[in-house]
Protein backbone atom coordinates (compact mmCIF):
# COMPACT_ATOMS: atom_id res chain seq x y z
CA UNK A 1 0.00 0.00 0.00
CA UNK A 2 1.27 3.45 -0.85
CA UNK A 3 2.11 6.24 1.52
CA UNK A 4 -1.06 8.09 2.53
CA UNK A 5 -1.05 11.85 3.04
CA UNK A 6 -3.41 14.23 4.76
CA UNK A 7 -4.37 16.15 1.66
CA UNK A 8 -6.20 19.50 1.34
CA UNK A 9 -9.07 17.62 -0.33
CA UNK A 10 -9.45 15.32 2.70
CA UNK A 11 -9.27 18.19 5.21
CA UNK A 12 -11.81 20.19 3.18
CA UNK A 13 -14.30 17.31 2.97
CA UNK A 14 -14.07 16.51 6.69
CA UNK A 15 -14.32 20.18 7.69
CA UNK A 16 -17.44 20.70 5.58
CA UNK A 17 -19.02 17.54 7.02
CA UNK A 18 -18.37 18.63 10.61
CA UNK A 19 -20.51 21.74 10.06
CA UNK A 20 -23.36 19.27 10.67
CA UNK A 21 -21.78 18.39 14.03
CA UNK A 22 -21.47 22.12 14.82
CA UNK A 23 -25.19 22.50 14.13
CA UNK A 24 -25.98 19.71 16.60
CA UNK A 25 -23.86 21.31 19.31
CA UNK A 26 -25.16 24.82 18.65
CA UNK A 27 -28.82 23.85 18.79
CA UNK A 28 -28.23 21.75 21.90
CA UNK A 29 -26.76 24.68 23.84
CA UNK A 30 -28.56 27.68 22.35
CA UNK A 31 -31.83 27.31 24.26
CA UNK A 32 -30.31 27.53 27.76
CA UNK A 33 -29.07 31.13 27.99
CA UNK A 34 -32.30 32.97 26.98
CA UNK A 35 -34.57 30.79 29.17
CA UNK A 36 -36.03 33.70 31.16
CA UNK A 37 -36.59 35.85 28.06
CA UNK A 38 -38.29 33.04 26.11
CA UNK A 39 -40.56 32.30 29.07
CA UNK A 40 -41.56 35.97 29.07
CA UNK A 41 -42.27 35.75 25.32
CA UNK A 42 -44.49 32.68 25.87
CA UNK A 43 -46.28 34.42 28.74
CA UNK A 44 -46.90 37.66 26.79
CA UNK A 45 -47.99 35.85 23.62
CA UNK A 46 -50.51 33.63 25.41
CA UNK A 47 -51.76 36.58 27.49
CA UNK A 48 -52.38 38.67 24.35
CA UNK A 49 -54.23 35.80 22.67
CA UNK A 50 -56.32 34.75 25.67
CA UNK A 51 -56.72 38.08 27.48
CA UNK A 52 -55.43 36.38 30.64
CA UNK A 53 -51.97 35.24 31.69
CA UNK A 54 -51.33 31.47 31.48
CA UNK A 55 -50.97 29.43 34.65
CA UNK A 56 -47.49 28.76 35.99
CA UNK A 57 -47.98 25.06 35.20
CA UNK A 58 -48.84 25.79 31.55
CA UNK A 59 -45.93 28.22 31.21
CA UNK A 60 -43.44 25.72 32.63
CA UNK A 61 -44.90 22.93 30.47
CA UNK A 62 -44.56 24.94 27.26
CA UNK A 63 -40.99 25.91 28.12
CA UNK A 64 -40.10 22.29 28.91
CA UNK A 65 -41.73 21.21 25.64
CA UNK A 66 -39.67 23.79 23.72
CA UNK A 67 -36.51 22.24 25.17
CA UNK A 68 -37.50 18.55 25.06
CA UNK A 69 -39.08 18.54 21.58
CA UNK A 70 -35.56 18.97 20.16
CA UNK A 71 -34.59 15.54 21.52
CA UNK A 72 -37.84 13.99 20.26
CA UNK A 73 -36.99 15.25 16.78
CA UNK A 74 -33.47 13.90 17.22
CA UNK A 75 -34.79 10.42 18.07
CA UNK A 76 -36.95 10.36 14.93
CA UNK A 77 -34.19 11.79 12.74
CA UNK A 78 -31.47 9.46 13.99
CA UNK A 79 -33.68 6.43 13.35
CA UNK A 80 -34.24 7.59 9.76
CA UNK A 81 -30.54 7.69 8.78
CA UNK A 82 -30.70 4.50 6.71
CA UNK A 83 -33.60 5.79 4.60
CA UNK A 84 -31.36 8.55 3.26
CA UNK A 85 -27.81 7.18 3.05
CA UNK A 86 -28.72 3.96 1.22
CA UNK A 87 -30.75 5.81 -1.41
CA UNK A 88 -28.95 9.13 -1.88
CA UNK A 89 -25.44 8.45 -0.57
CA UNK A 90 -23.63 10.05 2.36
CA UNK A 91 -22.75 13.45 0.88
CA UNK A 92 -26.05 14.00 -0.93
CA UNK A 93 -27.99 13.10 2.21
CA UNK A 94 -26.19 15.85 4.14
CA UNK A 95 -27.07 18.29 1.35
CA UNK A 96 -30.75 17.31 1.14
CA UNK A 97 -31.51 17.53 4.87
CA UNK A 98 -30.13 21.07 5.04
CA UNK A 99 -33.64 22.02 3.87
CA UNK A 100 -34.81 20.97 7.33
CA UNK A 101 -32.24 23.25 8.99
CA UNK A 102 -33.36 26.25 6.92
CA UNK A 103 -37.02 25.51 7.65
CA UNK A 104 -36.46 25.03 11.38
CA UNK A 105 -34.25 28.13 11.59
CA UNK A 106 -36.88 30.25 9.85
CA UNK A 107 -39.64 29.07 12.18
CA UNK A 108 -37.56 29.85 15.27
CA UNK A 109 -36.21 33.14 13.94
CA UNK A 110 -39.65 34.46 12.95
CA UNK A 111 -41.70 33.19 15.90
CA UNK A 112 -41.51 36.50 17.79
CA UNK A 113 -42.55 38.57 14.76
CA UNK A 114 -45.43 36.15 14.12
CA UNK A 115 -46.29 36.09 17.85
CA UNK A 116 -46.48 32.31 17.67
CA UNK A 117 -45.35 29.91 20.40
CA UNK A 118 -46.33 27.09 18.03
CA UNK A 119 -43.70 28.24 15.51
CA UNK A 120 -41.01 28.13 18.21
CA UNK A 121 -41.92 24.57 19.23
CA UNK A 122 -42.30 23.38 15.62
CA UNK A 123 -38.95 24.96 14.72
CA UNK A 124 -37.25 23.13 17.60
CA UNK A 125 -38.83 19.85 16.44
CA UNK A 126 -37.65 20.32 12.84
CA UNK A 127 -34.12 21.35 13.85
CA UNK A 128 -34.07 18.28 16.12
CA UNK A 129 -34.96 16.07 13.14
CA UNK A 130 -32.10 17.65 11.21
CA UNK A 131 -29.58 17.20 14.04
CA UNK A 132 -30.67 13.59 14.58
CA UNK A 133 -29.91 12.83 10.95
CA UNK A 134 -26.56 14.64 11.19
CA UNK A 135 -25.47 12.47 14.14
CA UNK A 136 -25.65 9.52 11.74
CA UNK A 137 -24.45 11.12 8.50
CA UNK A 138 -21.33 12.91 9.76
CA UNK A 139 -19.44 10.12 11.61
CA UNK A 140 -20.37 7.66 8.85
CA UNK A 141 -19.04 9.92 6.08
CA UNK A 142 -15.86 10.80 7.98
CA UNK A 143 -15.16 7.15 8.83
CA UNK A 144 -15.59 6.06 5.21
CA UNK A 145 -13.31 8.69 3.64
CA UNK A 146 -10.52 8.57 6.27
CA UNK A 147 -7.34 6.45 6.00
CA UNK A 148 -7.40 3.49 8.40
CA UNK A 149 -4.41 4.83 10.37
CA UNK A 150 -6.16 8.17 11.01
CA UNK A 151 -9.79 7.07 11.21
CA UNK A 152 -9.99 7.61 14.98
CA UNK A 153 -8.30 11.03 14.92
CA UNK A 154 -10.57 12.29 12.15
CA UNK A 155 -13.57 10.67 13.84
CA UNK A 156 -12.85 12.84 16.89
CA UNK A 157 -13.42 15.93 14.72
CA UNK A 158 -17.13 15.07 14.80
CA UNK A 159 -17.09 15.62 18.57
CA UNK A 160 -14.95 18.74 18.16
CA UNK A 161 -17.63 20.20 15.90
CA UNK A 162 -20.26 19.47 18.56
CA UNK A 163 -18.36 21.09 21.44
CA UNK A 164 -17.40 24.15 19.37
CA UNK A 165 -21.10 24.52 18.52
CA UNK A 166 -22.03 24.39 22.21
CA UNK A 167 -19.34 26.95 23.06
CA UNK A 168 -20.42 29.34 20.30
CA UNK A 169 -24.04 29.05 21.48
CA UNK A 170 -22.98 29.88 25.05
CA UNK A 171 -20.99 32.93 23.93
CA UNK A 172 -23.63 34.22 21.49
CA UNK A 173 -26.24 33.69 24.22
CA UNK A 174 -24.66 36.34 26.44
CA UNK A 175 -27.09 39.21 26.96
CA UNK A 176 -24.83 41.83 25.38
CA UNK A 177 -24.41 39.76 22.19
CA UNK A 178 -27.59 37.95 21.03
CA UNK A 179 -29.17 36.84 24.30
CA UNK A 180 -31.25 40.00 24.75
CA UNK A 181 -35.01 40.50 24.63
CA UNK A 182 -34.76 42.02 21.14
CA UNK A 183 -32.22 39.68 19.55
CA UNK A 184 -32.96 36.19 20.90
CA UNK A 185 -34.86 35.16 17.72
CA UNK A 186 -31.65 35.86 15.77
CA UNK A 187 -29.79 33.67 18.27
CA UNK A 188 -32.08 30.75 17.42
CA UNK A 189 -32.24 31.56 13.70
CA UNK A 190 -28.44 31.84 13.38
CA UNK A 191 -28.39 28.13 12.52
CA UNK A 192 -29.36 29.09 8.95
CA UNK A 193 -25.93 30.66 8.26
CA UNK A 194 -23.79 27.51 8.72
CA UNK A 195 -26.46 25.64 6.74
CA UNK A 196 -25.97 27.95 3.76
CA UNK A 197 -22.18 27.65 4.08
CA UNK A 198 -22.30 23.85 4.12
CA UNK A 199 -24.79 23.69 1.25
CA UNK A 200 -22.48 25.84 -0.89
CA UNK A 201 -19.42 23.70 -0.07
CA UNK A 202 -20.83 20.14 -0.19
CA UNK A 203 -21.01 19.93 -4.02
CA UNK A 204 -17.21 20.30 -4.02
CA UNK A 205 -16.80 17.34 -1.63
CA UNK A 206 -16.58 13.76 -2.98
CA UNK A 207 -19.10 11.04 -2.27
CA UNK A 208 -17.91 8.27 0.04
CA UNK A 209 -15.74 5.93 -2.07
CA UNK A 210 -17.00 2.94 -0.07
CA UNK A 211 -20.59 3.86 -0.97
CA UNK A 212 -19.70 4.29 -4.64
CA UNK A 213 -17.90 0.95 -4.94
CA UNK A 214 -19.92 -1.26 -2.59
CA UNK A 215 -23.41 0.16 -3.10
CA UNK A 216 -23.20 1.48 -6.68
CA UNK A 217 -20.38 -0.67 -8.15
CA UNK A 218 -18.53 2.44 -9.44
CA UNK A 219 -15.01 1.09 -8.92
CA UNK A 220 -13.12 3.53 -11.13
CA UNK A 221 -14.84 6.56 -9.59
CA UNK A 222 -14.14 5.25 -6.08
CA UNK A 223 -10.49 4.65 -6.97
CA UNK A 224 -10.01 8.19 -8.28
CA UNK A 225 -11.60 9.70 -5.17
CA UNK A 226 -9.38 7.63 -2.86
CA UNK A 227 -6.28 8.69 -4.79
CA UNK A 228 -7.27 12.35 -4.52
CA UNK A 229 -8.25 12.18 -0.84
CA UNK A 230 -5.24 10.15 0.33
CA UNK A 231 -2.60 11.62 -1.99
CA UNK A 232 -1.37 8.28 -3.34
CA UNK A 233 -1.80 6.39 -6.60
CA UNK A 234 -1.53 2.97 -4.97
CA UNK A 235 -4.91 2.28 -3.36
CA UNK A 236 -5.18 -1.26 -4.70
CA UNK A 237 -5.27 -2.90 -1.26
CA UNK A 238 -8.09 -0.63 -0.07
CA UNK A 239 -10.04 -1.16 -3.30
CA UNK A 240 -9.62 -4.93 -2.94
CA UNK A 241 -10.88 -4.79 0.66
CA UNK A 242 -13.98 -2.90 -0.52
CA UNK A 243 -14.51 -5.41 -3.36
CA UNK A 244 -14.29 -8.30 -0.90
CA UNK A 245 -16.87 -6.58 1.29
CA UNK A 246 -19.04 -5.91 -1.76
CA UNK A 247 -18.90 -9.61 -2.67
CA UNK A 248 -20.01 -10.54 0.83
CA UNK A 249 -22.83 -7.98 0.69
CA UNK A 250 -24.12 -9.38 -2.61
CA UNK A 251 -24.70 -12.70 -0.87
CA UNK A 252 -26.76 -11.05 1.89
CA UNK A 253 -30.09 -9.25 1.79
CA UNK A 254 -30.29 -5.71 3.14
CA UNK A 255 -29.84 -5.66 6.91
CA UNK A 256 -32.80 -4.36 8.89
CA UNK A 257 -32.84 -3.05 12.45
CA UNK A 258 -34.46 -6.27 13.73
CA UNK A 259 -31.78 -8.39 12.04
CA UNK A 260 -29.09 -6.54 13.98
CA UNK A 261 -30.47 -8.25 17.08
CA UNK A 262 -31.45 -11.57 15.47
CA UNK A 263 -28.22 -12.39 13.57
CA UNK A 264 -25.52 -13.60 15.96
CA UNK A 265 -22.64 -11.86 14.15
CA UNK A 266 -24.40 -8.48 14.50
CA UNK A 267 -25.83 -8.93 17.99
CA UNK A 268 -22.69 -8.30 20.05
CA UNK A 269 -21.48 -5.25 18.09
CA UNK A 270 -24.94 -3.62 18.24
CA UNK A 271 -25.14 -4.22 22.00
CA UNK A 272 -21.65 -2.69 22.37
CA UNK A 273 -22.73 0.27 20.23
CA UNK A 274 -25.85 0.91 22.31
CA UNK A 275 -24.03 0.61 25.64
CA UNK A 276 -21.27 2.99 24.49
CA UNK A 277 -23.90 5.56 23.47
CA UNK A 278 -25.57 5.14 26.87
CA UNK A 279 -22.17 5.57 28.54
CA UNK A 280 -21.94 9.00 26.91
CA UNK A 281 -25.36 10.28 27.96
CA UNK A 282 -25.74 8.52 31.34
CA UNK A 283 -22.30 9.72 32.40
CA UNK A 284 -23.97 12.91 33.65
CA UNK A 285 -22.30 15.26 31.16
CA UNK A 286 -25.54 16.72 29.85
CA UNK A 287 -26.88 17.12 33.37
CA UNK A 288 -23.77 19.20 34.10
CA UNK A 289 -24.15 21.31 30.94
CA UNK A 290 -27.94 21.65 31.02
CA UNK A 291 -27.87 22.88 34.60
CA UNK A 292 -24.28 24.11 34.89
CA UNK A 293 -25.30 27.71 35.58
CA UNK A 294 -27.40 26.57 38.54
CA UNK A 295 -24.67 24.23 39.78
CA UNK A 296 -22.06 27.00 39.70
CA UNK A 297 -24.54 29.33 41.43
CA UNK A 298 -25.12 26.73 44.16
CA UNK A 299 -21.34 26.43 44.49
CA UNK A 300 -21.17 30.16 45.25
CA UNK A 301 -19.90 31.53 41.92
CA UNK A 302 -20.94 35.20 41.46
CA UNK A 303 -21.14 35.10 37.62
CA UNK A 304 -22.06 31.46 36.87
CA UNK A 305 -22.64 32.01 33.14
CA UNK A 306 -18.93 32.76 32.66
CA UNK A 307 -17.98 29.65 34.62
CA UNK A 308 -20.25 27.67 32.29
CA UNK A 309 -18.45 29.16 29.28
CA UNK A 310 -15.16 28.22 30.97
CA UNK A 311 -16.36 24.63 31.12
CA UNK A 312 -17.17 24.89 27.41
CA UNK A 313 -13.60 26.05 26.70
CA UNK A 314 -12.21 23.09 28.66
CA UNK A 315 -14.59 20.88 26.67
CA UNK A 316 -13.11 22.14 23.41
CA UNK A 317 -9.45 21.99 24.49
CA UNK A 318 -9.62 18.38 25.65
CA UNK A 319 -11.46 17.29 22.51
CA UNK A 320 -8.39 18.52 20.60
CA UNK A 321 -6.18 16.59 23.06
CA UNK A 322 -8.21 13.44 22.39
CA UNK A 323 -7.69 13.92 18.66
CA UNK A 324 -3.94 13.40 19.12
CA UNK A 325 -4.28 10.57 21.65
CA UNK A 326 -6.86 8.30 20.04
CA UNK A 327 -4.52 6.73 17.45
CA UNK A 328 -1.74 6.32 20.01
CA UNK A 329 -3.51 5.04 23.13
CA UNK A 330 -6.45 3.39 21.35
CA UNK A 331 -10.21 3.79 21.66
CA UNK A 332 -10.82 1.23 24.42
CA UNK A 333 -8.06 2.54 26.71
CA UNK A 334 -9.11 6.19 26.38
CA UNK A 335 -12.74 5.30 26.97
CA UNK A 336 -11.87 3.50 30.22
CA UNK A 337 -9.60 6.35 31.39
CA UNK A 338 -12.38 8.84 30.70
CA UNK A 339 -15.03 6.80 32.54
CA UNK A 340 -12.77 6.19 35.55
CA UNK A 341 -11.80 9.85 35.83
CA UNK A 342 -15.41 10.97 35.55
CA UNK A 343 -16.49 8.53 38.29
CA UNK A 344 -13.89 10.03 40.64
CA UNK A 345 -14.91 13.62 39.77
CA UNK A 346 -18.60 12.82 40.14
CA UNK A 347 -17.97 11.57 43.67
CA UNK A 348 -15.89 14.68 44.39
CA UNK A 349 -18.72 16.91 43.12
CA UNK A 350 -21.13 15.25 45.55
CA UNK A 351 -18.78 15.68 48.51
CA UNK A 352 -17.97 19.32 47.69
CA UNK A 353 -21.63 20.29 47.21
CA UNK A 354 -22.49 18.68 50.56
CA UNK A 355 -19.69 20.49 52.41
CA UNK A 356 -19.68 23.88 50.63
CA UNK A 357 -21.74 25.58 53.36
CA UNK A 358 -19.31 24.44 56.06
CA UNK A 359 -16.01 25.02 54.25
CA UNK A 360 -15.38 28.04 52.02
CA UNK A 361 -12.87 26.28 49.81
CA UNK A 362 -15.36 23.60 48.79
CA UNK A 363 -16.93 25.88 46.17
CA UNK A 364 -13.61 25.94 44.31
CA UNK A 365 -13.25 22.17 44.72
CA UNK A 366 -16.68 21.75 43.12
CA UNK A 367 -15.77 23.99 40.18
CA UNK A 368 -12.47 22.15 39.74
CA UNK A 369 -14.25 18.79 39.84
CA UNK A 370 -16.69 19.93 37.14
CA UNK A 371 -13.91 21.17 34.86
CA UNK A 372 -11.87 17.96 35.27
CA UNK A 373 -15.08 15.93 34.82
CA UNK A 374 -15.61 17.67 31.47
CA UNK A 375 -11.95 17.08 30.51
CA UNK A 376 -12.19 13.33 31.18
CA UNK A 377 -15.44 13.20 29.20
CA UNK A 378 -13.69 14.57 26.12
CA UNK A 379 -10.79 12.14 26.54
CA UNK A 380 -13.06 9.17 25.87
CA UNK A 381 -16.86 9.03 26.33
CA UNK A 382 -17.38 12.22 24.31
CA UNK A 383 -15.86 11.42 20.92
CA UNK A 384 -15.40 7.63 20.88
CA UNK A 385 -19.02 6.31 20.92
CA UNK A 386 -19.89 8.32 17.80
CA UNK A 387 -17.24 6.93 15.46
CA UNK A 388 -16.61 3.47 16.92
CA UNK A 389 -20.10 2.37 15.81
CA UNK A 390 -19.09 2.91 12.18
CA UNK A 391 -15.94 0.85 12.82
CA UNK A 392 -17.77 -2.16 14.29
CA UNK A 393 -19.94 -2.80 11.21
CA UNK A 394 -19.42 -3.48 7.52
CA UNK A 395 -21.13 -1.46 4.78
CA UNK A 396 -24.38 -3.48 4.77
CA UNK A 397 -25.48 -3.19 8.41
CA UNK A 398 -23.71 0.13 9.10
CA UNK A 399 -26.66 2.50 8.32
CA UNK A 400 -29.08 0.46 10.46
CA UNK A 401 -26.51 0.27 13.27
CA UNK A 402 -25.88 4.02 13.15
CA UNK A 403 -29.65 4.58 13.33
CA UNK A 404 -30.09 2.33 16.38
CA UNK A 405 -27.04 3.77 18.16
CA UNK A 406 -28.05 7.35 17.40
CA UNK A 407 -31.61 6.76 18.58
CA UNK A 408 -30.24 5.24 21.82
CA UNK A 409 -28.13 8.36 22.34
CA UNK A 410 -30.99 10.78 21.73
CA UNK A 411 -33.44 8.79 23.85
CA UNK A 412 -31.10 8.66 26.84
CA UNK A 413 -30.32 12.37 26.31
CA UNK A 414 -34.05 13.11 26.44
CA UNK A 415 -34.58 11.02 29.59
CA UNK A 416 -31.68 12.69 31.43
CA UNK A 417 -33.05 16.14 30.58
CA UNK A 418 -36.54 15.05 31.66
CA UNK A 419 -35.68 13.24 34.89
CA UNK A 420 -32.60 15.08 36.22
CA UNK A 421 -34.50 18.12 37.63
CA UNK A 422 -36.80 15.87 39.67
CA UNK A 423 -33.91 13.68 40.79
CA UNK A 424 -31.89 16.76 41.78
CA UNK A 425 -34.89 18.15 43.68
CA UNK A 426 -35.34 14.99 45.77
CA UNK A 427 -31.71 13.89 46.11
CA UNK A 428 -29.90 17.23 46.20
CA UNK A 429 -26.12 16.84 46.04
CA UNK A 430 -26.46 13.05 46.13
CA UNK A 431 -27.86 13.06 42.57
CA UNK A 432 -24.38 12.67 41.06
CA UNK A 433 -23.91 9.39 42.94
CA UNK A 434 -26.38 7.91 40.44
CA UNK A 435 -24.06 8.89 37.60
CA UNK A 436 -21.07 7.50 39.52
CA UNK A 437 -22.83 4.13 39.61
CA UNK A 438 -23.50 4.27 35.87
CA UNK A 439 -19.88 5.25 35.14
CA UNK A 440 -18.45 2.32 37.13
CA UNK A 441 -20.85 -0.07 35.37
CA UNK A 442 -19.86 1.22 31.93
CA UNK A 443 -16.17 1.01 32.88
CA UNK A 444 -16.57 -2.69 33.73
CA UNK A 445 -18.50 -3.33 30.50
CA UNK A 446 -15.81 -1.61 28.41
CA UNK A 447 -13.05 -3.62 30.08
CA UNK A 448 -14.72 -6.98 29.49
CA UNK A 449 -16.64 -6.51 26.23
CA UNK A 450 -15.39 -3.64 24.06
CA UNK A 451 -12.71 -4.50 21.46
CA UNK A 452 -9.82 -2.29 20.40
CA UNK A 453 -10.34 -1.17 16.78
CA UNK A 454 -7.25 1.01 16.33
CA UNK A 455 -5.34 0.17 13.16
CA UNK A 456 -7.85 -2.43 11.92
CA UNK A 457 -9.79 -2.34 8.67
CA UNK A 458 -13.58 -2.59 8.67
CA UNK A 459 -13.29 -6.06 7.11
CA UNK A 460 -10.86 -7.24 9.79
CA UNK A 461 -13.15 -6.14 12.63
CA UNK A 462 -16.22 -7.69 10.99
CA UNK A 463 -14.47 -11.05 10.50
CA UNK A 464 -13.47 -11.08 14.17
CA UNK A 465 -17.08 -10.65 15.27
CA UNK A 466 -18.23 -13.34 12.83
CA UNK A 467 -15.62 -15.76 14.15
CA UNK A 468 -16.71 -15.07 17.71
CA UNK A 469 -20.37 -15.55 16.75
CA UNK A 470 -19.70 -18.89 15.03
CA UNK A 471 -17.80 -20.05 18.10
CA UNK A 472 -20.73 -19.08 20.30
CA UNK A 473 -23.17 -20.89 18.01
CA UNK A 474 -21.11 -24.09 18.21
CA UNK A 475 -20.90 -23.96 21.99
CA UNK A 476 -24.57 -23.01 22.37
CA UNK A 477 -23.86 -19.96 24.52
CA UNK A 478 -22.62 -16.43 24.22
CA UNK A 479 -18.94 -16.29 23.45
CA UNK A 480 -16.47 -13.86 24.97
CA UNK A 481 -15.30 -11.23 22.53
CA UNK A 482 -11.76 -11.98 21.47
CA UNK A 483 -11.21 -9.15 18.98
CA UNK A 484 -8.52 -7.70 21.24
CA UNK A 485 -6.36 -10.76 20.71
CA UNK A 486 -6.23 -10.29 16.94
CA UNK A 487 -3.22 -8.55 15.47
CA UNK A 488 -4.07 -5.16 13.96
CA UNK A 489 -3.80 -4.71 10.24
CA UNK A 490 -0.35 -3.63 9.15
CA UNK A 491 -0.25 0.13 9.72
CA UNK A 492 0.25 2.43 6.79
CA UNK A 493 2.70 5.30 6.74
CA UNK A 494 0.74 8.52 6.98
CA UNK A 495 2.31 11.88 6.33
CA UNK A 496 0.72 14.91 7.94
Swiss-Prot record:
The chain crosses the membrane at residues 11-32, 65-85, 91-111, 119-142, 154-174, 184-204, 270-290, 305-325, 332-352, 364-389, 400-420, 430-450. Residues 1-10, 86-90, 143-153, 205-269, 326-331, 390-399, 451-496 are cytoplasmic. Disulfide bonds: none annotated. It is a multi-pass membrane protein. GO terms for molecular function: D-glucose binding; D-glucose transmembrane transporter activity; galactose transmembrane transporter activity. The modification Phosphothreonine is found at residues 232, 492. Glycans are attached at residue 43. Keywords: Cell membrane, Cell projection, Glycoprotein, Membrane, Phosphoprotein, Sugar transport, Transmembrane, Transmembrane helix, Transport. Residues 277-279 are annotated as: Important for selectivity against fructose. GO terms for cellular component: cell projection; membrane; perikaryon; plasma membrane. Interacts with SMIM43; the interaction may promote SLC2A3-mediated glucose transport to meet the energy needs of mesendoderm differentiation. Facilitative glucose transporter. Can also mediate the uptake of various other monosaccharides across the cell membrane. Mediates the uptake of glucose, 2-deoxyglucose, galactose, mannose, xylose and fucose, and probably also dehydroascorbate. Does not mediate fructose transport. Required for mesendoderm differentiation. This is Solute carrier family 2, facilitated glucose transporter member 3. It comes from Pongo abelii.
